[in-house]
């Protein structure tokens, strides 16, 4: 009913709002207030809140997907596009697109979102879905990527718990053991 297909919660269309259906009423911004109350209650009980975030792709899919947000604003800055055929999206995520964290505009959006969740919503850390896609340079994944360097230098985010899902679908994307020292990693093979 929202024009979204294959939507299971990991196909974001906005990075600053809890999903409305997670709130008791699901309307009028209740989800934000309820999330804040939830975090306060967990903290009062001595439980930290780690937010699972998806900054590697959006619900807009590939070049045939719907225009829901970034595609309609500034496609070439928000998405990684194929160099030889920029109508097509680079897809390290298996969803049809990959956000372009090499773009200062996109990186700023992600950092603003992280700071919002940390300062306004008071979460204690983040688990980054397909974190290798976030740490890619032009072709490979690197500890010295712009994204990881920006996280390391941020006075708020660098002090939180940071957990990488250390892989993506691109060549060399499996990066277990290769994220910087301050990061914890999920080991999918260990399960």
Please report, for each region that a protein language model flagged, where it lies by residue.
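Substrate-binding/active-site clefts of carbohydrate-active enzymes
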Residues: 1-122, 130-153
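Active-site-proximal helices and loops of the catalytic beta/alpha 8
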Residues: 10, 130-191
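Generic enzyme active-site microenvironment
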Residues: 50, 127, 163
